[in-house]
Structures are given as structure tokens and as C-alpha cells.
């Protein structure tokens, strides 16, 4: 959500930010609604105040033997008028909130201009892709090993689901355990086991609602399956005032994530790249405003460290204005090398959302001994997507005989196992 005061103070800057997102100006419509809403609010409050004052005077008039009938008539008229004024105030407030809620976050000043992913800017590349003649894709390797079952998953769940078996299932578990240990022990994150079902308010707070409802799964009870643990971890600050001295919060969780993949027809239809259900380790930070830029770099380093320890080549790019997510003001994508595809593919996205989500959630902080509060900043990142890490390990560590070497960093989590073989 945007800061209405900032829009009032500098509407031109707000429209410039929207233009960088490829959107038309909106400040005029916002300020018109804001003015009408404030006028309606003033009328409503003035009528309430006059009704209360007139009601007080009625008692005094009667006590003094004065004619109170004009005041009685006035109070009756005000009582009839007030509900309409209250409804007008509510309606205009709802319209203003809806308009603000539909607009994305404004990009940070140092975000590169661009229309789409082709305009993203690479900032570093780590590791050299291995030369693997005839490299196979993960689904070819997994099916040949007898440890990846797409047909069985399709029979019970439909497209974009996978069954992992045996040592591939163990490898998935090992990857998640390794990531959680790294983030909690070396980067100071607190592990959380959050709900997978949330209410409307939670997905509104992080920005998935109202615009992206079609990307989510909703239950018959009205709950939403989380598309990412960003939703639950960030909402731990929902409607809260946090001691400023306790910040930053650093939280991590490994959860299943659920996405409808609306609009992805024909994309990555084979394998595990794009699934309706997948495992991910999420990183979330809640910070003071002055901490968030440094925290963004720190979070991105934590995600990169996962790939460095696994010996996986990757590159990090900063997303351009046309490719950023709805709630982000700046985003780094980390893309891992997949030999089977001969391409770098996203495995982590680390975003600084500034105060955008916090305003939607009413998440604030207060320094010790002070009365005033300030809106916090929120950040989130994949630390990393477990399924895509599994894919990357399979493709980068594949052997000519179809087996897969286990990266050294994972062997303690695999009981010392060094290689995954057929039906292992």
C-alpha cells in the first residue's frame, strides 16, 4: 500500500514511479477521491458533533424551562442524515483503498529501466558450467533411475505434479535440511513452522490479493493455500508494534508452496521446473527503514551461499522495472546453470519491499521510551527453491552411466552416500 501523505506532498514523483513501471498516472484520481472522502468525513463528524451538542442542550433547556422543541427537531433531522453521511464516508474510503491496493510498489532509484526479463542486468557470475557432452534433463535422468514418477502423479493429481522415490526423495529432504542449517547457524535466521492455510488478510498483506487471486488455490472454507512462506512469515508482524531494538527479525521456513500457474500454459510442461506444489526454503526479514538496503544484500548473499556450497554455477541479476514483482521495490534473481537445458534458470528471488507490505499489514516499530511509531520494512527471498535445487544437482552432477554424484555438502545429510544409482 502506498503512503497517501507522500502522494499528497509530491504527486509528480508518484506518477513518475508508476511510469517507470509502465503504468499511467494515478495521482489525480487518488487525490480527487482523497479530497471527496475527507470532505465526507468532515461532514459526518460535524453532524455527529452537532447532534451530541444539541442533545446536551436539550437537557439544559428542559431543566431551565426553555422550549427545547427546535433542538428536538434538529436532533431528529441529524439522526436521519448521519447514516447517509457515514455510508458516503465508508464508500469513498473503500474506493480509495481499492485504488491504492491495486497499484504496485514503486521501483527504487537504482533499479534499471526495462520492459521485461531481457532488460535485466547481470551483476555477477559464480562458477564455470561443466562441460557435459550429451547432458540430459532432470526428468530424463529421474525416470531412467526409476526414482521420478510423473505418470503416477498425473493419475492421482493431474498435470504439474511429481512423485519422488527412494534416494531422490531423500536428496530433496537433505537439500532442505542443509539449507535450514546454513541459514540458522551461519546467517542467524530463526526457523519457523508456519500454517499452510491463511485468511484473505494475510495474502492481501503481502500483495497477492486482490490482483493475483487466479494464481492461488482457495479451499471451500475460504482459506488460501500459501504460494510461498513469505506470506506466513511476513504476516507474523501483521497489526503489530515491534520494539525497534528487537529488529531486524530474520525468519526462515521450509514449506510446501501451492500455485495454480495461471498463464503458464505451454511453459515447462515436462519435469519439475513449474509445479502446482513444490518445496521451498523461504527467508524473511523485518527491519527498520535504514536497515533494509544492507539487509537485502545480506539476504541475497545467504541464498547465493547455498549454491556456492553445493558447487552449482549461477549468476545474479537485478530485475528491471518491467520485470519486478508487484510488492517489490528492488529484486535480485539468482539463476542456476542447468546443463540439460543449456541455460540459467531462476532458483531464488530476493526482494526488498520497503514499507509497501508493512502498510498493508499495519506493521510498525517503536523505539524504547518513545510514543511515536514508524512503518517497518519487509524483505523476502528464496533460500532456495528446493525442487529446483534438486534439478540443478541432478543435471550438474550427472555421470555418463546415468548415476548422480551427491555434492560433498549434502553427504552428511545422506548418511555418507556418494552416488545415487538406479532404483537407489
Swiss-Prot record:
Pathway: Aminoacyl-tRNA biosynthesis; selenocysteinyl-tRNA(Sec) biosynthesis; L-seryl-tRNA(Sec) from L-serine and tRNA(Sec): step 1/1
Gene3D superfamilies attached to this UniProt entry: Bira Bifunctional Protein, Domain 2, Serine-tRNA synthetase, tRNA binding domain
Superkingdom in the source lineage: Bacteria
Name of the top EC class for this enzyme: ligase
UniProt subcellular location: Cytoplasm
Reactions the enzyme catalyzes: tRNA(Ser) + L-serine + ATP = L-seryl-tRNA(Ser) + AMP + diphosphate + H(+); tRNA(Sec) + L-serine + ATP = L-seryl-tRNA(Sec) + AMP + diphosphate + H(+)
GO biological-process terms attached to the record: selenocysteine biosynthetic process; seryl-tRNA aminoacylation
Keyword annotations: Aminoacyl-tRNA synthetase, ATP-binding, Cytoplasm, Ligase, Nucleotide-binding, Protein biosynthesis
Primary site of residence: cytoplasm
The protein's Enzyme Commission number: 6.1.1.11
Purpose of the protein: Catalyzes the attachment of serine to tRNA(Ser). Is also able to aminoacylate tRNA(Sec) with serine, to form the misacylated tRNA L-seryl-tRNA(Sec), which will be further converted into selenocysteinyl-tRNA(Sec).
Protein name: Serine--tRNA ligase
Organism: Rhodospirillum centenum (strain ATCC 51521 / SW)
Amino acid at each position: 500500500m502506498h503512503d497517501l501523505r507522500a502522494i499528497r506532498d509530491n504527486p509528480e514523483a508518484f506518477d513518475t514511479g508508476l511510469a517507470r513501471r509502465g503504468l499511467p498516472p494515478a495521482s489525480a484520481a487518488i487525490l480527487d477521491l482523497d479530497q471527496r472522502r475527507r470532505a465526507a468525513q468532515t461532514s459526518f463528524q460535524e453532524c455527529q458533533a452537532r447532534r451530541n451538542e444539541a442533545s446536551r442542550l436539550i437537557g439544559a433547556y428542559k431543566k431551565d424551562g426553555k422550549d427545547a422543541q427546535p433542538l428536538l427537531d434538529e436532533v431528529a433531522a441529524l439522526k436521519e442524515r448521519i447514516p447517509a453521511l457515514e455510508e458516503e464516508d465508508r464508500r469513498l474510503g473503500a474506493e480509495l483503498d481499492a485504488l491504492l491496493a491495486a497499484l504496485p510498489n514503486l521501483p527504487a532509484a537504482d533499479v534499471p529501466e526495462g520492459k521485461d526479463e531481457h532488460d535485466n542486468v547481470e551483476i555477477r557470475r559464480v562458477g564455470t558450467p561443466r562441460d557435459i557432452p550429451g547432458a540430459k534433463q532432470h526428468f530424463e535422468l529421474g525416470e531412467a533411475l526409476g526414482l521420478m514418477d510423473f505418470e503416477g502423479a498425473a493419475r492421482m493429481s493431474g498435470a504439474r505434479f511429481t512423485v519422488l522415490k527412494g534416494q531422490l526423495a531423500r536428496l530433496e529432504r537433505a537439500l532442505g535440511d542443509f539449507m535450514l542449517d546454513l541459514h540458522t547457524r551461519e546467517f542467524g535466521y530463526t526457523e519457523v513452522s508456519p500454517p499452510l492455510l491463511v485468511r484473505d488478510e494475510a495474502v492481501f498483506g503481502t500483495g497477492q490479493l486482490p490482483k493475483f487471486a487466479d494464481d492461488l488455490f482457495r479451499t471451500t472454507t475460504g482459506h488460501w493455500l500459501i504460494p510461498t512462506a513469505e506470506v506466513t512469515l511476513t504476516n507474523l508482524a501483521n497489526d503489530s508494534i515491534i520494539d525497534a531494538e528487537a529488529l531486524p527479525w530474520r525468519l526462515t521456513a521450509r514449506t510446501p508452496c501451492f500455485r495454480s500457474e495461471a498463464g503458464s500454459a505451454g511453459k515447462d510442461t515436462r519435469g519439475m521446473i513449474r509445479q502446482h506444489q513444490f518445496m521451498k526454503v523461504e527467508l524473511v526479514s523485518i527491519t527498520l527503514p535504514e536497515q533494509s538496503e544492507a539487509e537485502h544484500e545480506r539476504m541475497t548473499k545467504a541464498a547465493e551461499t547455498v549454491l556456492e556450497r553445493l558447487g552449482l554455477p549461477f549468476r545474479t541479476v537485478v530485475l528491471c522495472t518491467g520485470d519486478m514483482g508487484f510488492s517489490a521495490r528492488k529484486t535480485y534473481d539468482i539463476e542456476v546453470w542447468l546443463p540439460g537445458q543449456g541455460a540459467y534458470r531462476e532458483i531464488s528471488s530476493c526482494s526488498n519491499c520497503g514499507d509497501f507490505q508493512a502498510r498493508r499489514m499495519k506493521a510498525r516499530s517503536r523505539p524504547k521510551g518513545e510514543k511515536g511509531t514508524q512503518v517497518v520494512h519487509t524483505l523476502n527471498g528464496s533460500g532456495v527453491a528446493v525442487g529446483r535445487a534438486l534439478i540443478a544437482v541432478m543435471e550438474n552432477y550427472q555421470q555418463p552411466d546415468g548415476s548422480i554424484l551427491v555434492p560433498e555438502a549434502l553427504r552428511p545429510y545422506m548418511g555418507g552416500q556418494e552416488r545415487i544409482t538406479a532404483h537407489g
